[in-house]
């Protein structure tokens, strides 16, 4: 039945819609990642809209941006990482999610334990059992990083449960392209 619906949608030019969630604890760069993806790939972006994009501040609630790539519309949700937001976003964790990008700050040792707990919580959700996860080790460009990324992954994250890991610096378009390619392929 899904095949028939998909065929009819494609026949009449309808878009496939994919829901992507960007999750993680606070101050890890989720909103910056969302707007960098939007800036990089939005087909409708102009100089005016680029300058009017919000300066990322800690998100209270959520942000949603949509981009279209090759007949696929991606609704990308960035949900604030404060504990009060994380309690609320758990209501959105359904099997309708197509992929999850879990972001953590690889330069902040103090936030890694909290990130580990949140990641484990998400991976244990039955509704997310078949949802692919991308683990983004963000802020690779910051000099205060004292632990190597392999050590972080070994200590704080179950490598066997990770579909893919991307080391990211927000100013590096190659990292951003890897992230976007992963979203598109999952």
From Swiss-Prot:
One of its GO terms (molecular function) is GTPase activity. Keywords: GTP-binding, Nucleotide-binding. GO terms for cellular component: cytoplasm; Golgi apparatus. InterPro entries: P-loop_NTPase, Small_GTP-bd, Small_GTPase_ARF, Small_GTPase_ARF/SAR. GTP binds at residues 24-31, 78-82, 138-141. Pfam families: Arf. Coiled coil: none annotated. One of its GO terms (biological process) is vesicle-mediated transport. Belongs to the small GTPase superfamily. Arf family. Binds and exchanges GTP and GDP. This is ADP-ribosylation factor-like protein DDB_G0292332. It comes from Dictyostelium discoideum. The lineage of its organism: Eukaryota, Amoebozoa, Evosea, Eumycetozoa, Dictyostelia.
């Amino acid at each position: 039945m899904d095949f028939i619906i998909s065929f009819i949608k494609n026949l009449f030019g309808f878009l496939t819609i994919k829901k992507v969630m960007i999750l993680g604890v606070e101050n890890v760069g989720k909103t910056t990642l969302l707007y960098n993806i939007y800036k990089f790939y939005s087909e409708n972006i102009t100089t005016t809209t680029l300058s009017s994009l919000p300066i990322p501040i800690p998100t209270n609630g959520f942000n949603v941006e949509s981009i279209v790539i090759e007949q696929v519309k991606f609704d990308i949700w960035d949900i604030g990482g404060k504990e009060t937001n994380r309690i609320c976003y758990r209501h959105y964790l359904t099997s309708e999610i197509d992929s999850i990008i879990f972001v953590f700050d690889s330069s902040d040792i103090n936030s890694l334990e909290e990130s580990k707990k949140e990641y484990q919580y998400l991976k244990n959700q039955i509704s997310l059992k078949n949802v692919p996860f991308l683990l983004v080790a963000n802020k690779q460009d910051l000099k205060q990083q004292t632990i190597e990324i392999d050590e972080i992954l070994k200590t704080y994250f179950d490598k066997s449960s990770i579909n893919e890991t991307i080391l990211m610096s927000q100013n590096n378009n190659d990292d951003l392209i890897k992230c976007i390619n992963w979203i598109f392929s999952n």
